[in-house]
Amino acid sequence: MSSHRDGAGADRITIKIHNMKRSASRSPGPASRSSLSRNSRSMGRGYDNGSGVPGDSPERLSPERMRRRLDRSPSRYGSPHREPYMRGPPPAERPAGYKVLCVSALPPKAPDDFIEETLYREYKKFGDFSVRLAHDLDERVAYVCFRTPEDAREAKHHKPRLIIYDKMAIVEPVYKSTTRPEYRPRGHSMSPPDYERYHYSRSPMGQGVPLDHRRPPIDPYDRYGPPHMHPHAVHPRDYRPLHHDYPHPPRGPPLHRGGHPHHLHGHAPPHQYAPMRPLAPRPHAPYEKPESKKDKFPNYLHHVQPEDDPLSTRTLFAGNLEVTIADDELRRIFGKYGVVDDIDIKRPPPGTGNAFAFVRYQNLDMAHRAKIELSGQYIGKFQCKIGYGKVTPATRMWIGGLGAWTSVTQLEREFDRFGAIKKIEYQKGEPYAYIQYETVEAATAAVKEMRGFPLGGPERRLRTDFAELPGATPAAPFKSSKPPYDESALEYRRPEYDPYYEESAAYAPRGGYSPYPPRGGYRGRGGYRGRGRGMYHYHNDVHRPPHPGSLAGSSSSVPPPGGVEDEWRRPPGESYDRGARSSSREPGVERSRSRSPLKRARSPGSDSDTSTRRNDALASASTVPDVARKCSTVWTGALILKSSLFPAKFHLTDGDTDIVESLMRDEEGKHNLRITQRLRLDPPKLDDVQKRIASSSSHAIFMGLAGSTNDTNCDDASVQTRPLRNLVSYLKQKEAAGVISLLNKETEATGVLYAFPPCDFSTELLKRTCHSLTEEGLKEDHLVIVVVRGGTA
């Protein structure tokens, strides 16, 4: 090695540097070489002491020193500004997934609103996402933030290029990396003082302070949620750009409003949509905790997802507005986030406070997006507070959170339990649908109970709200070639909504074990198979022929009699269970504490010979005709379902005969009882009926058989008489019981009547007194009627 040291000086310097890197034990050379080696080690560590070394060239500077020199040189600031965020980490450091796409090369003449709407239109089919526009020094870019990496990858694969204003825009993925502390995402949910403190980093006072010393590093994806919250606790789909068309700010330091991904790099490019004044006071020291918007509006950052918020609605309340603000100004600002149906501004008398407004959007998704983006932002001179307004019930409801997994069959199956569905509007693949009910009560129950329901799985929960009634006249209904009878004049009425079933639904699961085989097809609606992608309109007066051999629990698709099945739906809360079916009741069920003479006859201390003889006679009855012969007919009349009247007669098998005269009449005093609701034969609901029987002051159980038309008296010319077997067949096919609310206006006594088709539960009720009944003997069409005093349906 000595021969090399005797060579030229330049050779000696080169050899000495390499030797020092290989071994720290080599003896130091001359002073000039030692100085050079110290500079080399300093560059290797990336240490910056704030002073340059004469003779340093850019080729010998570390990347960290290059970055800091760019920070101190405004003229060289623009080029690397967005590069780390757009390109992400080097390929070796890139993780497998990304959630953000960067769209660059945007045409300068395209307005921001046009770009946003174009991106929403192009990417809405790939999943939930938000769009943010960032204005760099030399260009404008858009960031599309998806909820999941899978959605982002699919969107990138199918849309690698976009055409905007006849110009090709470039789509690049933004990789998540935790290795670079300078990646500083900044969400709009961060407090304004952070924005102001951020701008101080560019002042002369903060130039020499490294970025990492001014603020600790945070998760690169922290902007997807509110402060102090896990980044995945809030869905990114709820965030859109935080800007309005404010006038250009005065010359001077930029006042950024936040919410754009270019905060990742420790730079604050000017923003043309800045507010007219800072959002919060400038802090006195870098570590001083300043006053934030959250102190003024404590809950403005706390945004509950609509599927979890019972107060969510498409109407927003906007408070703290200028008294002189115009309708057009509010419509322009709020219109950025969706279609605004109506704006109502309330202006107090001068000097009594600020104005406020109610803004009604077309649907809940739009309203929630606006609530997220505008709450706490400046509208005019004042900082605005956004909340939900008052719910406006209607017969038409909106369902959000849908997707390619949703079908009309599924919607009809889940929503028909709340009442008569008039129409379903859904286009395959769309994220929303509309369902129109016959009554406001049915729609109210559906909106309340189906909010947050996981229709497409645990991660796909429904959003529900009321919607405007369409102005167009519904299309003409489909007519079957062989209807059993005309139901064109069917009417549907429902009683007032009853909170009792709201409470009973709380402990009823939405799913469960079904002892019956799965029902095939479209729940008996096989005629709807094979629909295309066009808008589907579901009407309630569709006629299809009945299936004479339909049985309860059958897996065949069997339509009910006379098109009634499409018009008659479940009452609110009567069963929100999914998949469960009726099962055999266990023996020894608790019996009612009724004043029934028959019950006293079975009691040990009873001395009623008549009741005892009747009980003994029923005990030997083995068929339906036997029961009819051995029981007296205590009620004759008709059951009415829409425009169909079914003559019937009831034979008392157990309970209190006083119920007949006190409750079993209509408003005019006639024995015509109208079925308005239905109860699904699910175990939780049947248990609820059993509890009502046991806890009521009195009850009665009847066997219902076909009656004579001579015993009916109905003045409604639109009502047509049908045989009772049609109603029995319908209830069997629907696996449901008819429900009637009973009311005596004179005594204000109330009660509920249940009409059960032949099933395990109804058989068990009959066997309370008719112990010898067999399955063979119950094949004849009949109903089991249960009347419970007290309560409402």
From Swiss-Prot:
UniProt PTM: Phosphorylated by Hipk at Ser-23, Ser-25 and/or Ser-27; the precise position if phosphorylation sites is unknown.
Spans annotated as Disordered: 1-93, 243-296, 507-623
Subcellular location: Nucleus
Comp. bias intervals (Low complexity): 25-42
Expressed in which tissues: Widely expressed. Shows some enrichment in the central nervous system.
Keywords: Developmental protein, Differentiation, mRNA processing, mRNA splicing, Nucleus, Phosphoprotein, RNA-binding, Sexual differentiation
Disruption phenotype: Female flies show stem cell tumors in the female germ line as well as female-to-male somatic transformations.
SPOC domain sequence ranges: 624-791
GO biological process, one term: mRNA splicing, via spliceosome
Domain RRM: 314-391, 395-469
An example Gene Ontology molecular-function term: RNA binding
GO cellular component: nucleus; precatalytic spliceosome; RNA N6-methyladenosine methyltransferase complex
Biased composition (Basic and acidic residues): 285-296, 566-593
Residue ranges with Basic residues bias: 257-268, 526-536
SMART domains xrefs: RRM
Record's subunit section: Component of the WMM complex, a N6-methyltransferase complex composed of a catalytic subcomplex, named MAC, and of an associated subcomplex, named MACOM. The MAC subcomplex is composed of Ime4/Mettl3 and Mettl14. The MACOM subcomplex is composed of fl(2)d, Flacc/Xio, Hakai, vir, and, in some cases of nito. Interacts with Sxl. Interacts with Hipk; leading to phosphorylation.
Function: RNA-binding protein that acts as an associated component of the WMM complex, a complex that mediates N6-methyladenosine (m6A) methylation of mRNAs. M6a modification plays a role in the efficiency of mRNA splicing and is required for sex determination. In the WMM complex, may act by binding target RNAs and recruiting the WMM complex. Required for sex determination and dosage compensation via Sxl alternative splicing: m6A methylation acts as a key regulator of Sxl pre-mRNA and promotes female-specific alternative splicing of Sxl, which determines female physiognomy.
Family statement: Belongs to the RRM Spen family.
Name listed for the protein in its UniProt record: RNA-binding protein spenito
